[in-house]
Amino acid sequence: MLKVDNSLYCALSKIDPDFSKDWSKSFFTTFINLKNTRLYFSEPANKGYIIFSYTSFEIEIVSIFINLKYRRLGIASTLLEKVKEFAIKNKILRIVLEVSVENNIAMVLYKRFGFIEVGIRQNYYKKKNKLIDAKVMSYSI
C-alpha cells in the first residue's frame, strides 16, 4: 500500500495545478489506498503522473496528467506503456479511459497508442459551469 502523506498530495498538486480541485485530500487518500489502485510518476520525476485502478480483466485509467511545460515530450506515452506492461504482466485483457470530446490532443495520442472509441458518456465533465461529453476509449491487449 502506498503511504499517502501531505508530501505526495503536494507533489501531485505541483504537477497539476487543478489537482486539489479535482481530488480532495480525503477522497484521494481513500482512493489511492484501495488494493487495486496504482499511481505512477513520470521519469523525469514531477513532470506527470497516471492513476489507474484494475480488476482481473480490465484497467481503468482514472487520471493522466502531464504538466503543461513538459507536454509533447513523450512522457504520456511512456506512462501509458508502463500501464500496458502492468496489464501484460498481470494478464489483464484491456485498458479503458474517458477523455473529454474537447481534448483533441489527448484523443490523437490515445488513437496512436491503439485505443479505439467505444462510446460516449454525456455530460461527464464539468468545466466552468459547462457540461462536456466524454469519449470512452478501449485498448485490447
Q: What does each of the following model-derived ranges do?
A:
Residues 22, 73, 128-131:
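Non-catalytic, surface-exposed connector residues within folded enzymatic/regulatory domains
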Residues 53, 58, 102, 107, ...:
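A short, glycine- and basic residue-enriched loop/turn
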Residues 93, 100-103, 123-141:
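C-terminal "cap" of GNAT-fold acetyltransferases
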Residues 45, 90, 116, 130-132:
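Structured loop/turn residues at beta-strand edges in well-structured enzyme cores
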Residues 2-69, 80-82, 86, 90, ...:
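Acetyl-CoA-dependent GNAT
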Residues 64-81, 88-90, 94-95, 100-108, ...:
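Conserved glycine-rich acetyl-CoA-binding loop
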Residues 1-3, 116-118:
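Short secondary-structure junctions
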